[in-house]
Amino acid sequence: LLPQGLRAFALYIQAHYLYLKGEYGPSAGLVEGALSMGAAAYPIPALYLHLVAVMDYMSLKQTEKARAHLLAAWALAQPDDLIEGFGEHHGLLGGMLEAEIKPAWPEDFKRVIAITYRFSAGWRKVHNPETGHDVADDLTTTEFAVSMLAARGWTNQEIAAHLRISPNTVKRYLSAAMEKLHISHRQDL
């Protein structure tokens, strides 16, 4: 049997797998159960569990639950500067870093984004040849976040409210992203 802390991390991996399969509710339930049964005592696995909960709840458009998990993860990360996971998961967090971390902790946000760019460059080197699908590497992190939300069916108004920007700014981000991706329709995101 794995030690308790590793079991908690294994549950993160299982929850992430469910997320990738589009099973957001079961993934969120696994996370909530793991955290309530003692995983919260292990800061690093708990941080990663909270991050996958953000991913799940953003996919379910339950932004308040996503926000609560993001801020719980951030509280765990701050004392020891454990921000790597935020950079690793940026693209899956549905703009939550832009909505919550950027306004309150702008310098930390810049460091997270620097991690995101480094992580993404390495990830694309593995992902693109393995899958045969190119992941865009020239979008800004905000263009990517806005595009991900749009691809998940969020309206410009919903994205604007979530990111606390104007709908016109959302349109500009989407237009820039679509131009860089050489696509002309939102559904192609």
Residue ranges and their predicted role:
Residues 5, 44-45:
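Residue signature of alpha-solenoid helical repeat architecture, marking inter-repeat boundaries
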Residues 124-175, 179-184, 188:
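Helix-turn-helix DNA-binding segment
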